[in-house]
Amino acid sequence: MVTVRVWDVPTRLFHWALVLCLLGLVLTGQTGGDAMVWHFRLGYAVLTLLGFRLLWGVVGGHWSRWSRLPLSPASAWAYWRGRAPLHHTVGHNPLGAWSVLALLALTALQAGTGLFSDDEIANAGPLSPLLTGAWVSALTAWHKNLGKALLIALVALHVLAIAWYRWRQGEDLLTPMLRGDKVLPAEVPASRDGAWHWLRAAVCLAASAAAVRWLIGLG
């Protein structure tokens, strides 16, 4: 058994930056008023992070790539029966992979609907002028009510799952996302995590930020 780099620095920074942004969005959304300026800024930051993760899933570290997610029904069934191969549990296990995709998709939907929302008082998303009043009202209702509730519930479920794995399975999922490493058999491939790797991440982040800037300027 050896120490293997599973989660590279860019992946870990993305993860914790997203956590902080989501916490900030909940707080600023509940506070309202002048805090909504930061609510919008954090929303743009979330869109930038999601765009980065989309790109990083293609060019990032070995275990951060979309191709490494065990998403087939057969993988989930084998994991449920305790017969999953090692490479299906090094990064995200099959159930965790689907949970992560659902969380990212719902976060993207919530951030996207925020671009079109309008509280009809003082705050309007930059793309709200592009839609009719009926569509804006519908998307605003989703964003402020069901969408927010679903996202908070899914985040809570994610946290509970991490605690359950620690308590019942004895598997620490939190420390590897902090330090990046797991103790694994020597044959398990490691994720690259050096200066050139970080430069590639910076390019992906810059490209995502430029895309978000262009998007919010469409309104």
Give a label for each model feature.
Residues M1-G219:
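Membrane-embedded alpha-helical bundles that constitute the cytochrome b-like, heme-associated redox core
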